[in-house]
Amino acid sequence: MKRRTTVALSILVLLVSSATSLAADAADIEFKRTRLDDKFRSEGVAVGDFNSDGRMDVGAGSVYYAAPDWKMMSVLEQPKEFDPHAYSDSFCNFADDVNGDGRTDLIVVGFPGKETLWFEQPASPDGAWKRHVGTPITNNESPSFLDVDGDGRRDLLLGYDPGKHIGFARVGGATPWKLVPVSAENAPGTDRFSHGIGAGDVNGDGRTDVLVTAGWWEAPDSPSKTPWVFHAVNFGEPCAQMYVYDFDGDGDNDVASTSAHMIGIWWHEQTPDGWKTHTIFKDISQTHSLNLVDINGDDLPDLVTGKRYWAHGPTGDVNPDHPAVVYWFELQREGGKPRWIPHRIDDDSGVGTQFEVADVNGDGLLDVVTANKKGAHYFEQVRK
C-alpha cells in the first residue's frame, strides 16, 4: 500500500501551503524584524483577526497587537506583565471562532497543569472580552491545535486529568469542552511538565495518529473507539511539538523533534527494522517549540525553531545566555537522504513554548511570529 504523507500538529501547516507557492532560492529570502513589545507577556502567540477589521493581528496571552501599526490592545481589564526570571501563565495561544459567531476568539493554554481559557471577541472593538474555561487541567508543555478526529474542526491535543490520559478536547459548544481519551489511564506524556506530543499519520493508513516520546497511538477507524492501540517506540529525549512527515522520501513517514531544555534537533527515521534517530543540528539549546512549514515554496516542508531564552531562568539549563536565535532549516534531498541547511532569521529574540508561522500581511509569503522573555516579535518574509 502506498504510504500517505501527512504534515500535522497545526492547522496552519495545512492552510499556508497556498501561501508558499512562490518558490525561491534560500539566498533570496530575508526576514524583516518588527518588535511588537519589549515586555514578557506570553510564551505563545496566535495569528488571527482579533478586531474584525480584515487584518491579521497577533495575540499574546492577555493582549493582542493590532495590525497594521501593532498597537497593543488588552484582552483583560489590565494587560499582564511577567518577570523574565519566572514564568508566564500563557504557554500556547491559538486563534479560532470557538462559538461560531463569525468572530475570531483567543485560546490561551496556561501554565502546565492549569486551565486552558478562551476569550470571546466582543461584537465591537471597544467591548469587553468574555473569559471562558475550555479545559480545567491541561498537561504536557506542548499542547497543539489541529483536527485529530477528522470532523473538520480543530481540537486541542493534550494530556489531562483526572486519569492521566492523552486525548483531545473538542473545541466549541458547551464549556468546559468535551474531552476524548486517546490513551488508557496513566499514559506516558501526561504529567503536567511532560515534554513532547504530536500527531500525524505514522503508519500510512490515512488516519491521524497521536505520539509522545515513548511511542504512538494508532487511530482506529472511528476515533470514539478508545483507548487507541499503543505502540512503544523510543522517540528520543524530552522535546516540544512533534511532527510526522516522509523526510527521506522512501514512502514511509518519519518524525521530527527538538530538545526542550538540552541541545538537539532530530529526525527519527522509520525503517523496516524499527526507528533510527539522526541529529540535524546541535548548536542551539532549549529549542522548546517547533513548526514544520514550507518557507521557500519548493514543496518540501522546512523546520522552524529557535532558542527559548531563559527557559529556566538565567542559570538554568544549558547555555541560558547564548544568543536567542531563530532559524529555519531548509529540507533538501540528495540520493534518497534528507539534509537540512540552517538559515538564521534572528539572534536577539528566540522562541517561546509555541509560536506561529503564517502569512500575516497577505503577500503570499510565510512570516514568523514569536513571544517570550525578550518580548514579542514579527518577522516578515521578504524576497530579494
Residue ranges and their predicted role:
Residues 8-19:
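Bacterial N-terminal signal peptides
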